[in-house]
Design a protein with these regions (language model features):
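HhH-family (HhH-GPD) DNA N-glycosylase catalytic core used in base-excision repair
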Residues: 1-319
Length: 319
């Protein structure tokens, strides 16, 4: 249940909208929303001891959302500023996994998964409802280290993002509009460390961004939404999965092609590394819930030994 409270408008001290969300079960906010941020210095997402700050480019305009730590009774207070404040607080229940139903997931036969589910009962898949805000950083993350991608994303947001409305932490930004993204010149993609292949993929998405978002909204199934994404040059299976896991809380899409994921899943489930095909075979018994199983593995605390060559951090600004 969500209670929408009146709030004063036009003040940086007082929110433009606020809500109290009372979930049916206690939600682990960091575990649920942790996948959304792109590194510790993401200009759109910042954590502190009291909760999380998140900026949005909503259909009504920019917004800053503050989600506070749950109260003693499990209720979660959220406040928002900016033209998109009402949209942002309305999105809180879905963002915190209200529609993510784990009741059909049976992991009782695997000790690691069973233990992780027991220790993380408040883990849910977050649904942002903002396709482009998940798709563009996923493209930037293609075939490079996380460090490179996070650095590029932060640079582009600092240069072209809009200052966050309200009392957000210094340096927070709202992602550019579609038109502003389209207007970024090739040399600034380059200066941000995004090589020409990824920059072309981003521009290809931006050409059809409006129709792509509409197609994803109207898709009868999440599989159809993934198919729509993969029609764009430069958007493959990995990128579609990384996007829909965040924008639509896709419970089954697995990031096939990830540099480490298959090895990690294999070692966690059977004690040895596997390739992508092996990972999909291991996850097959949980079809329909495979992303949930991956999230349980990630939340389990399992550590695997990274062997072999590491990806080299490259500075594409000088290529």
């Amino acid at each position: 249940m969500t209670a929408v409270l009146p709030a004063a408008s036009g003040s940086h001290a007082l929110p433009d909208a606020e809500t109290v969300y009372r979930p049916a079960v206690a939600i682990d906010v960091p575990a649920t929303l942790g996948l959304l941020g792109r590194g510790p210095y993401d200009p759109t997402t910042q954590w502190d001891l009291g909760g999380v700050w998140r900026t949005w480019r909503t259909p009504q305009g920019p917004a800053t959302l503050r989600i506070h730590r749950p109260a003693w009774d499990g209720s979660i207070h959220a406040t928002a500023w900016g033209p998109g404040a009402a949209w942002a607080v309305d999105a809180v229940p879905a963002l915190l996994g209200r529609d993510d139903d784990w009741s059909g997931l049976d992991v009782s036969g695997h000790p690691l998964l069973r233990g992780s589910l027991h220790r993380n009962p408040g883990l849910r898949l977050a649904r942002t409802g903002r396709l482009l805000e998940a798709l563009l950083p996923a493209i930037i993350e293609q075939r490079v280290t996380s460090l490179e991608a996070y650095r590029s994303w932060a640079r582009l947001l600092r240069w072209y993002g809009e200052p966050a409305p309200g009392p957000a932490p210094e340096g927070m930004r709202v992602v550019p509009t579609i038109e502003q993204w389209r207007g970024i010149p090739s040399w600034d993609w380059h200066r941000a460390g995004v090589d020409p292949r990824r920059a072309r993929a981003a521009q290809a998405v931006l050409v059809v961004a409006t129709s792509l978002e509409r197609a994803a909204e109207r898709a009868e199934t999440l599989a159809a939404a993934a198919d729509a994404l993969r029609t764009v040059p430069g958007v493959g299976q990995w990128t579609a999965a990384e996007t829909l896991q965040r924008s639509h809380a896709h419970p089954d899409l697995v990031s096939v092609g990830d540099y480490h994921l298959a090895h990690y899943v294999g070692e966690a489930l059977i004690g040895r590394r596997v390739d992508d095909d092996g990972m999909l075979e291991l996850l097959e018994p949980w079809t329909g819930h495979r992303q949930r199983v991956v999230r349980l593995i990630l939340a389990s605390g399992f550590r695997f030994e990274r062997r072999g060559p590491r990806m080299t951090v490259q500075d594409h600004r000088w290529h």
